[in-house]
Amino acid sequence: MEITDLIIGKESENISDIYIFLYEEGPVVFDASAVHLLFYFPEMEMESVLCSDRRRHRVIRGLALEPVLERLAQYPCLVDDEYIRVMGVCE
């Protein structure tokens, strides 16, 4: 799976946010964000995936955005062309 420097940078510093990266195939959540999201949606499936940086990353993919954003609506949210950032979910 392709992982960009943007994703690696965001997730390497992430302690309390959920970053949902917008891939053509659909939304994907990596590493710390995947762990945070699993807390709110234990029914989601987290995988360990070998990515383009030759490392294994925790990944949740194939999620539906609407129920996730509805459930996390009480948290501030930033929307970008490449990702959605839900802030402060684990403070």
Stretches with model-predicted labels:
Residues 1-91:
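Basic, polar low-complexity surface loops/patches
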